[in-house]
Structure formats: C-alpha cells, structure tokens
Amino acid sequence: MTSIKTKVIHGGISTDKTTGAVSVPIYQTSTYKQNGLGQPKEYEYSRSGNPTRHALEELIADLEGGVQGFAFSSGLAGIHAVLSLFSAGDHIILADDVYGGTFRLMDKVLTKTGIIYDLVDLSNLDDLKAAFKEETKAIYFETPSNPLLKVLDIKEISAIAKAHDALTLVDNTFATPYLQQPIALGADIVLHSATKYLGGHSDVVAGLVTTNSKELASEIGFLQNSIGAVLGPQDSWLVQRGIKTLALRMEAHSANAQKIAEFLETSKAVSKVYYPGLNSHPGHEIAKKQMSAFGGMISFELTDENAVKDFVENLSYFTLAESLGGVESLIEVPAVMTHASIPKELREEIGIKDGLIRLSVGVEAIEDLLTDIKEALEKK
C-alpha cells in the first residue's frame, strides 16, 4: 500500500498526459473545440469539467480513499452542494459546535428549503441515538471540531448512522487526509475547506469533497454542475501545489502545536486548553486511535477574560486574522470573528465563551513562537 507521504506528490493525475509536464498545466479556458457536430471530446465547458480541476479532484479522491472527487469555489460551496442532496422534510443531525459558516448555511439558508436539523453533542453517543427521527438522513460533523477541538469517534458514529440508514458526512479540514482517513473509518462523504491546510499558504479559497459511493458521486457531480460553484483552473493549480508539501507541513504544524499546548497548560495565565494531543483532553484516546498526529489547531481560555484583547494585540508572530492552516501562525477570537454568526446564548451553551482564543500554529521556529506567547502573556 502506497504511503500517503508518496501519494501527496504522486497521487491522482500527477503529470500532464498531453505534454508530460511534471506540474499539471493551468488550462485557462472556458470551452473546448469539438471533433464535429455532436462529437465532443472529454471536455466541453469548464463549468462541467476542466483538466486542471479534474487533476485536483482525482488527487483528493486518491488521498481520502474515495471513488471520485469534486472541487468547489469554497468550502461552504462544497458543503452547500452536499447538503443539497437532501429534500424538504429531511432531518440532519448537526454537531453542536460546527463552524459558524456551516451553522449559518443550515440555519438561515437550508431551512428555507424545508430541511430540518437538530444540534447534538456527538461526543455523547446516547444523545446521538436519541436524536434520530424517522426522517433523519444524515449526521454532519467536524473532528477535530472548530473551535473547541472536540474529537468525535468516526467509526462509532458511522456505525450508528448505518444502523439508521443515514449517511455520515465528515468535515476533515482540521486533520486533513494526512492525519485522518474518515472513509476508512466508515464515513460516506468527506469535505474540506481546501483554503486551509490543503492549500496551506493562505493564497486560495477552495472546497473539496469526495465519497466512497458511485451513486453519491453521480448525485454530487450533478449538483456541482447544476449549482455551478466550481473551482477555477488557477485556484485548482494552487491547491495541487500546496498538497505536494502537505506531509512536511502537517508534521511541523503538529509538532509545534504540541509544544505550545503543553506550555499553555502549565501557565497560570491560562485556565483551560483545548488540544487533542494533551492527556487531559477528553477525546485524547479517540484521537490516538483515529489520527496519526494531533494537528496544528489549539484553543484556550485566559484566567483573566478581560486580558484577551491585550494578549492578541501584543503578539508579533501570531497574526490576528480569520482562517487557518497556512504556514504562518494566526490567532483569532471565535465569538467575535469566525463564530459570530452563532447567537451568543447558543455559543455559550456549547462552550464557545467570549474569551475563547483560537491559534492556528504555523511552521515557524518553535522557540520564536513560544517566546512570543510568553511575552504577550506577561504584557497583558
């Protein structure tokens, strides 16, 4: 079996079949010459298919163990297409601490189509089992989750879903296929914001989807073409280039994050740390079972919640910005940034406090990052 370290470089369509180019060319075209009337070649129109995009789609399917991949103009575009598989009256079980954009899409957009949902703490399998209705068609979750780094048992949840004839939809953005393989654990569809670790350089907005079912692939392909939120060739090329160094980057992100999380856990200025690599994390054992390392994301709370503003503004190497997964370190406050679309009462109920801080730990020298955090904590 080929190692994923090799697959990120050689997987999918790694060379151009026409010219032999080692880097897949950017086919910057909207349409394609046909052989004759009613005689199209492999590609007809770039919304329906583009060679550069197709190479990326083949790559994500290869990395995740899917039968077909799909590249979208953003992570949310991919989520929208997947959730468009469902119809009025269908019920979705949604993890209670999903990304704010996913919650907004479900709560403000998809409910208008008649889809219904319930927010459920999926770390409690009894709560999950109790949440099923006759109309339940799918379970949707992230693991690790954004921003509380909750680790959910993909194998157990997938088995429960199958017992209820429901699909398991896993957002694998935080872990990437390098650290975690949801399809191998029973998931039906895997989604990514490729803007994050797959792209890896904060220079592209993209979404990727893959599935282990030919039937689902056919339906998703129809929706991708019909909705039209496809990824352009330039951006497809950028994501492919980013994936080539995924193994190197994820190992560096994970190593740096582990050391920072361990430091934060010992700091008197910090009251709580959320990182799956810590023995104190409630999902640590599950993470060890289904992940090869623990990733580059950390969330934590300061002992003095009033010190949050000073802390985030006193850092030198952690840029205050939304998004995550680039080579540079970022910091944000979910309650007023990435998760502001979730009502305050609901945010607090699920544990996203106003003072929660989220770090996207980059690949800089660990001594510089630790010094930066220590000095900012002392200045606050």
Swiss-Prot record:
Signal peptide interval: none
Cofactor(s) needed: pyridoxal 5'-phosphate
Record pathway: Amino-acid biosynthesis; L-methionine biosynthesis via de novo pathway; L-homocysteine from L-cystathionine: step 1/1
Single GO cellular component term: cytoplasm
GO biological process annotation, one example: cysteine biosynthetic process via cystathionine
Keywords, sorted A to Z: Amino-acid biosynthesis, Cytoplasm, Lyase, Methionine biosynthesis, Pyridoxal phosphate
Pfam families attached to this UniProt entry: Cys_Met_Meta_PP (PF01053)
Family annotation (InterPro entries): Cys/Met-Metab_PyrdxlP-dep_enz, Cys_met_metab_PP, PyrdxlP-dep_Trfase, PyrdxlP-dep_Trfase_major, PyrdxlP-dep_Trfase_small
Record-linked PROSITE patterns: CYS_MET_METAB_PP
Catalytic activity, EC: 4.4.1.13
Enzyme class: lyase
Compartments it resides in: Cytoplasm
Similarity field: Belongs to the trans-sulfuration enzymes family.
Stated role: The enzymatic degradation of amino acids in cheese is believed to generate aroma compounds and therefore to be essential for flavor development. Cystathionine beta-lyase (CBL) can convert cystathionine to homocysteine but is also able to catalyze an alpha, gamma elimination. With methionine as a substrate, it produces volatile sulfur compounds which are important for flavor formation in Gouda cheese.
The protein's name in its UniProt record: Cystathionine beta-lyase
